């Protein structure tokens, strides 16, 4: 994904949230909702923050350093927070459901690509080293290359010292907001997807 139509992403994400709102008891997004760019992207990129919801107003901010492949899913994830979802795992779930339902290939790909690190992490914890390495070989070389380039891109922007402080503080913040697993909550989206697939057969 070399470029992304941000206006089309906004249209598709809102449309799909309207589609799933009733099924998951979500608030439908208002037409006026739109993301704002971060004021200090260099600082946010330095700590690995892709987006966040502002604490004082119902608005969400996206990092202008986002790669095109990351933009649709991050847009949908942050919109989930605006719609009242506090859990990071649930925001990931709704971000995935919304983007993966899109008729736009780039938006669909963004959904699956965004969950790849969480799938890798879960697989690494569940499989033996041999099984994990065998499973990794099923991932296409193109996806592996894109993933490695994404990791290198953000590592180049990351500030280890500030990043470690932010990670610790954010972990405390999540736990203080009734998310006991803290930052690990993000990867719990895999369990949510498996549970949804088992109950509905949709995934």
Protein language model features and the residues they cover:
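Membrane-proximal, solvent-exposed terminal domains/tails of membrane-associated proteins
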Residues: 89-93, 105-112, 141-145
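Auxiliary, metal-adjacent structural segments of Zn-dependent hydrolase domains
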Residues: 1-60, 64, 68
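Polar alpha-helical coiled-coil and adjacent low-complexity
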Residues: 107-116, 135, 188-193, 201-202
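Soluble non-cytosolic domains of exported or imported proteins
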Residues: 4-7, 11, 65-70, 82-89, ...
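Amphipathic alpha-helical blocks and their helix-capping loop/short-beta junctions
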Residues: 122-150
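Pan-zinc metallopeptidase signature
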Residues: 142-203
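Short helix/loop segments within enzyme catalytic domains
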Residues: 96-128
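Active-site recognition of the HExxH zinc-binding catalytic motif
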Residues: 73-92, 96-97
């Amino acid at each position: 994904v070399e470029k992304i139509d941000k206006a089309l992403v906004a249209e598709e994400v809102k449309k799909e949230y309207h589609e799933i709102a009733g099924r998951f008891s979500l608030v439908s997004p208002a037409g006026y909702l739109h993301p704002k760019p971060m004021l200090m992207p260099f600082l946010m990129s330095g700590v690995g923050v892709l987006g966040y919801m502002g604490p004082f107003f119902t608005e969400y901010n996206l990092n202008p350093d986002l790669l095109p492949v990351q933009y649709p899913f991050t847009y949908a994830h942050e919109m989930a927070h605006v719609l009242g979802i506090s859990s990071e795992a649930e925001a990931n779930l709704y971000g995935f459901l919304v983007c993966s339902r899109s008729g736009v290939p780039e938006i669909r790909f963004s959904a699956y690509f965004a969950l790849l690190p969480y799938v890798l992490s879960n697989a690494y914890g569940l499989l033996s080293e041999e099984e994990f390495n065998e499973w990794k070989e099923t991932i296409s070389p193109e996806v592996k290359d894109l993933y490695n380039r994404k990791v290198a891109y953000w590592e180049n922007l990351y500030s280890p010292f500030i990043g470690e402080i932010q990670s610790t503080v954010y972990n405390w913040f999540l736990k203080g907001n009734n998310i006991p697993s803290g930052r690990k909550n993000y990867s719990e989206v895999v369990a949510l997807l498996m549970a949804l697939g088992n109950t509905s057969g949709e995934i």
